[in-house]
Design a protein with these regions (language model features):
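Conserved Rossmann-fold NAD(P)-dependent oxidoreductase catalytic core, especially the SDR/UDP-sugar
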Residues: 60-113, 130
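Conserved beta-loop-beta element that borders a ligand/cofactor-binding pocket
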Residues: 118-140
Length: 263
């Protein structure tokens, strides 16, 4: 839409949703030889990596992109922070000098994989890297169905599980996440940036909102579920706001989203 020359790289398990408007390369992100071949003879102004989960993958990407790109936008996560009830700022996890293991004795957790990937980019990338730390992403087409889990269970009179209803979380809408990634590609920024809608919500308030929408009372038991966390887990977006991005208000879109899911 903006007139850019765009190439997407996927495993080819789904059709290219953009038809001939973008180039489509089929590859396995975890296969370094396929990845290297895809960049042969090509230089990209901006590369977006949404599926780097380990320090090894980050290291391989640096080895390839050091001669083939001028800028990388790496999709990281709020999971690099501990859920300890304190609002998280970017400096609460510093990837510089963080220890990473390229040949781990056991598979990295999602959070640890992202921490170590950020650390590798700090050490080995000779191009600017923006690490975008997203909270849980919400949307109508969320393949994880995390919000849908609560809506459907309450609608059907089935129990939902929590360990702390007063725990608060931050979220971002899928469309807003996409807008932020685009902005990050062209903004004069570098390093880690939290990207989250303004505001936070307790699990109690979230469930009450769903109850209002579906007109049913939730059955709540103690246990684990997608949003069941022991303590509040949310971020501040002040750094990105100061850099020029305008975030939405969580309260403006959460209830309308629940209404769409409940239909």
């Amino acid at each position: 839409q903006q007139g850019h020359d765009v190439t997407i790289a996927t495993r080819g398990q789904h059709d290219n949703p953009f038809d001939e408007r973008v180039h489509h390369t089929i590859l396995d992100r975890t296969n370094s030889s396929e990845l290297r071949k895809a960049f042969e003879g090509t230089v990209y102004d901006i590369v977006y990596d949404n599926i780097c989960y380990t320090p090894k993958e980050a290291m391989e990407l640096c080895a390839i992109l050091n001669d083939h790109t001028t800028r990388l936008i790496f999709t990281s996560t709020m999971s690099v922070y501990e859920a300890d009830g304190v609002a998280k700022r970017e400096e609460d996890f510093n990837a510089m000098n963080y220890i990473y293991d390229l040949i781990p004795s056991q598979q990295h957790s999602y959070a640890e994989g992202k921490r170590q990937a950020e650390a590798v980019f700090e050490d080995y990338a000779n191009f600017p890297v923006v690490a975008v730390r997203f909270p849980i992403v919400m949307g109508e087409d969320d393949y994880t169905s995390r919000l849908s889990y609560y809506v459907e269970h309450i609608e059907q009179g089935e129990a939902i599980e929590f360990v702390n209803l007063d725990a608060e979380m931050s979220f971002i809408l899928a469309d807003e996440a996409a807008e932020f990634l685009y902005w990050a590609g062209f903004a004069n920024i570098e390093g880690p940036y939290n990207a989250t809608a303004n505001g936070k919500i307790s699990m109690r308030k979230l469930i009450q909102t769903i109850e209002q929408v579906v007109d049913k009372e939730a059955i709540i038991v103690e246990g684990t579920s997608p949003y069941s966390i022991p303590a509040s887990w949310y971020m501040t977006n002040a750094k990105a706001t100061e850099a020029g991005f305008t975030f939405t208000q969580l309260t403006d879109w959460l209830k309308p989203l629940i209404e769409k899911i409940a239909k």
